[in-house]
């Protein structure tokens, strides 16, 4: 998840439930044709993209995988990544960055010269927005390539590009002349009366950005500020890159610990893996690779708490270097905030967010934690421990202290086994499923693999449901849903040689406005990337070209519709490839979530780049994605979308009921744990960190702070590992990680108000589209919510508004 970046604000980067007895209510709207539906499914699921197995006619040729997605091999047509003619090679990317920098410098000279004229003043903010777009388009595509591309040469070129452009952006952010001209224009009432609301909004945004970048500092201090900002960016990039790395690749266990493993299959797995250990072996010691499935199986099935603890800590340990990088960028952020005159980095970050100040965030989180703990969390923990001898006699506080984080999956297995025995009535024995210790689930078709880690806590229902949700089925189903809600659909779009980073994996979709047949933007989908966690990348933002810009020259770098550059969004996931790839319900949630961001980018149509799509407040941007998870959890949606990958039969509603019930077993606990992460984020960017700077940068100890937060908040408390060094959002969402929870609360209220009655309602979809999605960043988020929910008291966006959201949501 990530939103686009303003000129000076570049960031590297559950919902309401319905009764299962409610029947699916499909509003009477025109849905996509069967031909387009089948074409979408085939594009992701079939070897040859044909309809009904026909491949001997023109229609069949149209669906050829080679013709559609692997480009023309005869050299008749080729381009660069995302149809940017420069991006044909790593060297081309560096050339593109240099061209972009030159374009930006030329534009700055032009603006500085023309601002002396009346027309130059009127065009100034639009050209500032154009300047921002030039740089952000370059740095955003570089960031995408750095994170996603398989070729290290491309990755190295992307890093070089990022450094070139980011350094220049920081120079612009402290350009006194650019700032002074902007201030004069914004303070000229006659000029303001001739500007559009969007121009005024962007002008105010950029003025804030200049001022938050130390524009009032003396030259020496500004230089220090730029250096500090760039150093934070480099450290953050390193932190994110290494966040999935383990402190050690192997963990050793003694022969006594080995004997504590009751499952003979797991023992044999340990012995086989131990034989492959590359280091010096000690007698009576076994070695387990932490990157394998063995540690997870031990935590789920082994009765020895000490052994589970060892596995859990090993999996959650970050390297010492990683923790040190975290300490340093937290300290540098505190120093940056101090230089700008803020009480803390959190105060700096929240000044123009929905929450406005850290005190409001802490109040929101504290109230949420108290409500969760006193209502659902303790109930879930009691249910989880019901089968454990003596646990029923413990007080609430004793129970909370007794259940450790490494007990969670072990207890959950016992809990769900008991639950299944009373609900499935022997269904397990009659269903062909994998054994409890396999890491992937295979159906009777040996070429079909589910893209999920499966363990013994998976129910028969959850395993069987995978067969009804192939990637193609989900994408075609989303097109059907968006057609119903917004009159927008997906159409398979052929790619040209060089347009995508992997011709075998990547698919391109045209996002089509059904009402006028116009293209709204493009999606590039890579669901089986070997190196990327599920992510949303805005590669190009929507923007109307200025009159002086050359359409033909611009068309070499972006995809156009008349005088608009169209939004380009990439969705990347790390699912296991199959033929077809079948998805767990959690992975269906993931696609829906990321598609929420994508549709925000498509529907949020503005003239100016800085306001389009997801370029809104960070604590507002997650609402569309989180709301989509309400759709993915609603049986009225899943039953309409799901169909068996071989037979085409609709998904049985009883399977959805069983699986949904089991998925929510620890819903409140998981929300509470997420609130702990948000609280840690606040603590690491608080006033106390600024005060610690008096003792020197080395006084910042993030591990001590992490363990103290865990001790204070207790539920599944971790006082042993350095997991915080593996939490990338501490950089990419520094001081605003709470936004996930705030937006979940807001999305829940929106769901209850608009969609709970009928998730396919065109009326509800249009209201949501018109009041929330279409504005991008042009309208105050609290005003959007007040209008969408018809709750006028939200419009002020103060602490009371956050309290109202909390009271009306059902987290």
Swiss-Prot record:
PANTHER family: MITOCHONDRIAL INTERMEDIATE PEPTIDASE, PROTEASE M3 THIMET OLIGOPEPTIDASE-RELATED. Residues 423-450 are annotated as: Disordered. It is found in: Mitochondrion matrix. Its EC number is 3.4.24.59. Zn(2+) binds at residues 593, 597, 600. Its cofactor is Zn(2+). It holds the Pfam family Peptidase_M3. Residues 431-450 have a biased composition (Low complexity). GO terms for cellular component: mitochondrial matrix. It comes from the Eukaryota. Its main location: mitochondrion. One of its GO terms (biological process) is protein stabilization. The active site is at residue 594. This is Mitochondrial intermediate peptidase. Belongs to the peptidase M3 family. Cleaves proteins, imported into the mitochondrion, to their mature size. While most mitochondrial precursor proteins are processed to the mature form in one step by mitochondrial processing peptidase (MPP), the sequential cleavage by MIP of an octapeptide after initial processing by MPP is a required step for a subgroup of nuclear-encoded precursor proteins destined for the matrix or the inner membrane. Binds 1 zinc ion. Keywords: Hydrolase, Metal-binding, Metalloprotease, Mitochondrion, Protease, Transit peptide, Zinc. It catalyses: Release of an N-terminal octapeptide as second stage of processing of some proteins imported into the mitochondrion. It comes from Lodderomyces elongisporus (strain ATCC 11503 / CBS 2605 / JCM 1781 / NBRC 1676 / NRRL YB-4239).
